[in-house]
Amino acid sequence: MVTLKDVKKNPYIVEFIKQTEESMTAISYTNHGLRHTNIVADRATSIAKKIGLNQREGELAGMAGFCHDMGNFMTRTYHHYFGAVLFQQVFGDKFKPKELALIMQAIANHDVEEMKFTHPISAVLVLADKSDVDRSRVTEKDMEKIKADIHDRVNYATRESKLNIDKVK
């Protein structure tokens, strides 16, 4: 059974994320590298546990969190779809079909306007991803360009952020 630890040390996945970080830095886009993917993976795992998903679902959420942005090195516009397909190409024969589908669906749905959450893992990933707001994610140095980009403005303005999950609500 594949674990989050296995995914985090897979050379293909790590290289895709490194290439994403280089690509996003080259265009002065918000950091989507290993710092971000590790935070999202950890938060997704934690959120899943807090809302009552079982341990394996938490692990799947963490895997989706670690891999969710790795398609950015191919294209920013469709990175979520490419990320899902890349995950399948690397790990397709190592998962039960349903687990693979849940991870792919979460990755594919994390950055689309018409998000369809048919499983809590997808919603968990979006919460984990969007909650990583921090000045360190801003790669742009020109303050006028930072002011012009909504992602950079929000991240630049944030020195610390915390996410609290209220299971009752």
Task: Give short role names for the model-derived ranges.
Residues 13-19:
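Active-site-adjacent bridging/hinge elements
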